[in-house]
Amino acid sequence: SHYAEGPGKN
């Protein structure tokens, strides 16, 4: 759940 946009986004 950690992507470039931030944790919890995907």
UniProtKB/Swiss-Prot annotation:
Molecular-function GO terms, alphabetical: oxidoreductase activity
Coiled coil: none
UniProt keyword annotations, A-Z: Membrane, Mitochondrion, Mitochondrion inner membrane, Oxidoreductase
UniProt membrane topology term: Single-pass membrane protein
One cellular component (GO) term of this entry: mitochondrial inner membrane
Main location per the UniProt record: mitochondrion
Membrane found in the keyword field: yes
Superkingdom of this protein's organism: Eukaryota
Location within or outside the cell: Mitochondrion inner membrane
Metabolic or biological pathway, per its Swiss-Prot or TrEMBL entry: Energy metabolism; oxidative phosphorylation
Any single biological process term in GO: oxidative phosphorylation
Similarity comment: family membership: Belongs to the cytochrome c oxidase VIIc family.
Subunit note: Component of the cytochrome c oxidase (complex IV, CIV), a multisubunit enzyme composed of 14 subunits. The complex is composed of a catalytic core of 3 subunits MT-CO1, MT-CO2 and MT-CO3, encoded in the mitochondrial DNA, and 11 supernumerary subunits COX4I, COX5A, COX5B, COX6A, COX6B, COX6C, COX7A, COX7B, COX7C, COX8 and NDUFA4, which are encoded in the nuclear genome.
Function: Component of the cytochrome c oxidase, the last enzyme in the mitochondrial electron transport chain which drives oxidative phosphorylation. The respiratory chain contains 3 multisubunit complexes succinate dehydrogenase (complex II, CII), ubiquinol-cytochrome c oxidoreductase (cytochrome b-c1 complex, complex III, CIII) and cytochrome c oxidase (complex IV, CIV), that cooperate to transfer electrons derived from NADH and succinate to molecular oxygen, creating an electrochemical gradient over the inner membrane that drives transmembrane transport and the ATP synthase.
Official protein name in the record: Cytochrome c oxidase polypeptide 7C, mitochondrial
Protein source organism: Thunnus obesus (Bigeye tuna)
Lineage: Eukaryota, Metazoa, Chordata, Craniata, Vertebrata
